[in-house]
Amino acid sequence: MERKLMIAPSMGCCDLFDMERQVRIIDEKSDFLHMDIKDGVYVPSFGIGPEFLAALKDKVSTPMDAHLMIKHPQQYLETFAKAGAAYITPHTDCIEGAAFVTINKIKELGCKAGIALNPSVPLETIEYYLPLLDKVTIMIVDAGISGQKVIEQTYDKIRKLVKIREEKGLDFLIEADGSMNRDVYRPLYEAGADMVVLGPPALWNKADDFEEAWAIMENELESELN
């Protein structure tokens, strides 16, 4: 059976004046709901918060992934678990020194544990706790800064991670995140990514009407992979 490339739209990009309709469409058609949580400290921009997840918790059936681009994620694990996150994904450099404690806490809260690596972070950083993870997010641009070009060296990082997963018999998703567009679907798929995060360039900017934008995105994804 041919492997599918899963999609995770970044929900903070939804149009406030068309929010309910867009959420319903995304919930029906997506594999994950990607929630970018940014504090203006770890990254220079701001994102959505736990209230956003809590508002959707009983309205959606698709798993919500809280991508914590925040300096002190340990302080907010319980908050995001209660808000309805199925996955909680902090960054490696924000849990350094307490990685096992953080990952085990996420699991104790009933969530699946992810980890995110910026492009300059080597895979060796997560070697010892990789068996505990349910998802690894490979940032293909530096986190939290818009308008970047995809760093193509990250394709090799994904290939290496796929090899490690196979050799060790592990079971975690590999997600690619950052400046997603049709030109990188095939390279990421061929490298072994299981899922891609969709932002404005890949989805919302495709058309003024969201349903039309979604159809364009689907056609681009299909044409690039076939």
Model segments located where?
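Hydrophobic faces of well-ordered beta-strands that scaffold small-molecule active sites
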Residues: 6-11, 33-35, 56, 64-68, ...
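Structural motif
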Residues: 28-29, 59, 83, 109, ...
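N-terminal active-site wall of soluble small-molecule enzyme domains
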Residues: 34-105
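Conserved, mostly hydrophobic/aromatic
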Residues: 19, 36, 80, 136, ...
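Conserved anion-binding
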Residues: 18, 86-173
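Catalytic cores of alpha/beta
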Residues: 22-23, 74-82, 120-131, 178-196
